[in-house]
Swiss-Prot record:
CDD domains: CMPK. Pfam families: Cytidylate_kin. Disulfide bonds: none annotated. Belongs to the cytidylate kinase family. Type 1 subfamily. This is Cytidylate kinase.
Length: 215
């Protein structure tokens, strides 16, 4: 049996990560937040006081990165996300990490991968694809509230500005720009709770995963 793969893409703070984790738990699949792989490389550079454009060391860290050590709570800071967005512009680093992400997707019984180029580049043959949308104001508010909930300090307008710049970088970069796969289901979560989004996603997944199991 080949692994069952679910691809979830979307801009920063759209809710794709939360959705991916719920789907993976519900269907007993492995989960990979591919954004954490770029954050992991960025963190390694910053820990060694190296510049984000230090390609030689970034390549080394990308090759050595152990996906099993990626910790969402540890790598989830807004600042690290900004750094990872810049790391992701490097085509050599993307190539290394994409290959490792594809190998992860081969794990049985299957995986849910979320990121920005899963359905288009990493797993173009995924069994089902989603593209999660939300307007930038809603995403900024979510990120702001998330930081406050964790006891951190944040400025809503700075977060909004950062997300707008990040969207621009992700959409316009030459390598793997952020865009929906042609056969992706588009879900706008601006006015939806995570429970409602999850229910809609499951309504698309259920018939396909049943066919996969039978087949």
């Amino acid at each position: 049996m080949k692994p069952f793969v679910i691809a979830i893409d979307g801009p920063a703070a759209s809710g794709k990560g939360t959705l991916a984790r719920k789907i993976a738990a519900h269907y007993h699949l492995h989960h990979l937040d591919t954004g954490l792989t770029y954050r992991g490389v960025a963190y390694a550079l910053l820990q060694h006081n190296l510049a984000l454009d230090d390609e030689k060391n970034a390549i080394t860290y990308a090759k050595e990165l152990d996906f099993n050590t990626l910790n969402l709570a540890f790598l989830s800071s807004h600042e690290l996300g900004e750094a990872a967005s810049k790391i992701a512009l490097n085509p050599t680093i993307r190539k290394i990490l994409v290959e490792k992400q594809r190998n992860f997707a081969k794990t049985l019984p299957g995986s849910v991968l979320d990121g920005r180029d899963i359905g288009t580049i990493v797993c173009p043959d995924a069994d089902i694809k989603f593209y999660i949308l939300a307007n930038v104001q809603t995403r900024a508010k979510r990120r702001y509230q998330e930081i406050l909930k964790k006891g951190g300090q944040a400025n809503y307008h700075e977060i909004l500005n950062d997300l707008e710049q990040r969207d621009s970088r992700d959409i316009t970069r030459k390598e793997s720009p952020l865009k929906p796969a042609e056969n992706a289901h588009l879900l706008d979560t601006s006015e939806l709770s995570i429970e409602a989004t999850f229910a809609i996603a499951c309504s698309f997944i259920d018939p396909i995963i049943k066919m996969h199991i039978i087949g």
